[in-house]
Curated annotation (Swiss-Prot):
InterPro entries: Bactericidal_perm-incr_a/b_dom (IPR017943), BPI/LBP (IPR030675), BPI/LBP/Plunc (IPR032942), Lipid-bd_serum_glycop_C (IPR001124), Lipid-bd_serum_glycop_CS (IPR017954), Lipid-bd_serum_glycop_N (IPR017942). It is found in: Secreted; Cytoplasmic granule membrane. When bound to LPS, interacts (via C-terminus) with soluble and membrane-bound CD14. Belongs to the BPI/LBP/Plunc superfamily. BPI/LBP family. PANTHER family: BACTERICIDAL PERMEABILITY-INCREASING BPI PROTEIN-RELATED (PTHR10504), LIPOPOLYSACCHARIDE-BINDING PROTEIN (PTHR10504:SF66). Its main location: secreted. This is Lipopolysaccharide-binding protein. The lineage of its organism: Eukaryota, Metazoa, Chordata, Craniata, Vertebrata.
Amino acid sequence: MKSATGPLLPTLLGLLLLSIPRTQGVNPAMVVRITDKGLEYAAKEGLLSLQRELYKITLPDFSGDFKIKAVGRGQYEFHSLEIQSCQLRGSSLKPLPGRGLSLSISDSSISVRGKWKVRRSFVKLHGSFDLDVKSVTISVDLLLGVDPSERPTVTASGCSNRIRDLELHVSGNVGWLLNLFHNQIESKLQKVLESKICEMIQKSVTSDLQPYLQTLPVTADIDTILGIDYSLVAAPQAKAQTLDVMFKGEIFNRNHRSPVTTPTPTMSLPEDSKQMVYFAISDQAFNIATRVYHQAGYLNFTITDDMLPPDSNIRLNTKAFRPFTPLITRKYPDMNLELLGTVVSAPLLNVSPGNLSLAPQMEIEGFVILPSSARESVFRLGVVTNVFVSLTFDNSKVTGMLHPEKAQVRLIESKVGMFNVNLFQAFLNYYLLNSLYPDVNDELAKGFPLPLPRRIKLHDLDFQIHKNFLYLGANVQYMRV
């Protein structure tokens, strides 16, 4: 608080895949809860992604021999196979406790077009065919791990798909001939498709989803002093319709990180399920931030005359300060003053239902600037105030604003005799409200980021204040390129 200072399923699935076991026995300072609505959205987005990937499948040519009593022996070949259309309809994404996620797709269809050749002795015939694949079901488990950089890894396991209905339509001069052994041909086409679908899913997870997960932040900078640690503290807690993902959420000094000795209290999350995702942020995160700021001297402030508005009725020199303490003018004629404000201890954020507030305790020491440029202390004052905090969440970060009550001032020590505390209190409140707090609010407006992967945006935000933690509900949108 310085015055005149400064500092394939790429979607909500990205959040789900943060659920990797890490340090055991540590309470998180941030929890992300994904509801059944969020899982449903992730499955829907994943379905669109897989559907696009299906069009990229390259189907191999295949051939075989046939023998028909009335015709004799011959060879056939199917080539230039291309997927013309595909419809992936029903899908579900469910937690797989202790392992990861389970994706199921049902009631889907694929249309394939290609060409055929038949050869018997010196006779060669050719034509085209259409293949309608119906009642396709796909299931795959997504197993989660973690790499040395503390980012999640994902591998596809147990992929299976079944085609229950397949119809081959052959055109050409001897289409009737191929229809005589269509069961054999359909069986081969079915095996090719089933193999290629799982191969496509494996490739999509390896080439698309895994690199996407590398965009998830492990740490993020808040300002020139603070950073936040988004590493994970435990395995996901899978329930009937939700999945809780637990982050360390630890605020630290970017220039000198030290271990946090105060344990984070347990957060009892409400059973809300109206929105896709909920963020629970412990008051511990905010209190560590104020402690780091305090240790770095960032909460201290200095007031000099050149920092006051030009039209201010009060100047920081001994002549103008005579109404506060008459003796100062006689003892230190025509000298400038400097006020140094220090916060006695790191203020704690009071988080209770409907209330966010701070009660910082400060001391202000007045110095006379001597002709030698040395400073001489002439008075010390104690200052207490209540500051209410409002937080705002946008689609990627948390921002704040302070709303202070009037500061109360008491005299601790005066080396210049009588001191008009009430007059100084009025001056201090004017300065705090018009200079100091606006500067602080400008810094708070920069906010700190939420742990979101690329192209994820939040909307329909719902902010709640509970005992010892803040709770933000939101719906999610994946922003396609």
